[in-house]
């Protein structure tokens, strides 16, 4: 294992060829350690098992990290040939228990493990070739090809950790111990856990875009907060300390829990931490691939809801105010005691980066100033729901890494665990999980009388998403004609008296068209390639409202709130299934429709011709296809050779409609003369962009 230990890379120093070698070494070790993780499965059959019922089978994650590289390299136009389009669809999207996540196993025909191994080898060779041949310009920034390689590497290291948690949830007889590093053998009684004072300070959070290390989008930007004086536990809460809560009826007493926590406890019928085991006499602890007698001096591993209940129990028992630290308070602790960042380590200053153990260890083993385990051992839950700092912007090639978690339901974990490597082990890392999720995570307790400060933006500030909301829903605030409503009216008039029940909308955007059509059809499946966009109609469907900010003039903005019931869409909202998928590489499950609508999507696709050539396969006999497009072809999105029209061929002009007709004519007939509908993009209170979208209607032969 030690030969695979490495650190994330300084992207500013050195010479180009040295940096290329560093990145290749980092990639190869990342790939190897990820594959080593799965050697703990007892047989290939276990790949088809789920560690958690709310996660995919393990084979998905084995394939997913390789597919991620290929899909991102395709998206970045660094490569232009896929290895296996089917794999690159079914292994593409993971699960965060969002309502657009697809966990129906009937929708997946999982391939053999050997086929995935073969795919991984091919993907590894492609990534290696890119590393060896891509231009290297220092500093490497997020617009460079090698940034995409680093994105894939750090993504794989995230899954190294999260997949280890899933393996930890498998039955013990399905795993093999001793194949992934050495677990800690130091066990004893829990130490007394004192509260130590921490002086407050004005803090500046976030990092600049010229930072020397790779970062995810949520790390950049700036946010200032004054942290007041507080006290914090010297150690992480140990198994032994948490046992007092368990023995005092902690899991049976409603008043200790938040409403969300009590609902979870009742649903799970939880009586102790998930990885604890109890027989008639003793407790034991489940590790990734083995079970050991309970190490009472190791950190307890719980979800946020359990950690919060412990704090509430302690508050009631002692008459003081206890809670979890905020993100800013955790950062204050690391600043005071000058915890070095990853590149500054000679040896990891905590149980992190797999440098010491392949398990947690005693809470009093790694000292950082007056405290212990400020980093490493297990992640530390905070009170802070994740959101973007001021200046946040998404990376264009991974636009849904962070924004789906900016919902107030994902709390930050800080500090890393024994298996946190790469970016996860850096001081600026910002990872967040649903409050009921398990990771290798525990907590320390803070004592403070200061009101809890939660930085959580309720209004959507993503510029592109907010403008899309305004385009789709802004007619509630302006006199602008709404394109989606006009298109829906035209569709309903066109298909009147036709036996249409199942509809596929291939460009859900922020949902207006789907909601307009929902009262008139049995089921609307509305897809969008971006989780940034699809989460807005999901929120409308689930909460009944969305909020967003759009530009007025200069520094002035409008704060918008769209309420679904104001549009009369509440009654039939359940007729819609919003899902995330790429129209250029759709899953096989999206078939058997009576009507498919392609609204202003062709011009956004990498290869619209592929969609047009195969769209008939997804329609029922005599099915209808309605295409709306502005034909605004742009080489940035769609290479010239993939345009269906809008060019000269043999000296003669080929319009986009003619090109589309040439492609569709084998399977479709044009039903009626196309019409133009005005499409207004509202960019500010004084700037509108007006386009004409041509709408054509086709019938399957």
Regions found by a protein language model. Give the residues of each.
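Conserved Class I S-adenosyl-L-methionine
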Residues: 553, 637-674
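Conserved alpha-helix/loop element of class I SAM-dependent methyltransferases that forms part
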Residues: 478-500
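A short glycine-rich, Lys/Arg-flanked "PGG" loop and its adjoining helix->strand segment in the class I
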Residues: 609-621
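S-adenosyl-L-methionine
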Residues: 539-585
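Disulfide-stabilized, aromatic/cysteine-rich ligand-recognition loop
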Residues: 2-56, 63-67, 75-126, 130-133, ...
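Conserved beta-strand signature within the Rossmann-like core of class I S-adenosyl-L-methionine
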Residues: 622-630
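A short acidic, Gly/Pro-enriched loop at the edge of an enzyme's catalytic core
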Residues: 584-596
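Functional-site microenvironments in short loops/helix caps that host divalent-cation chemistry
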Residues: 152, 156-158, 166-186, 191-215, ...
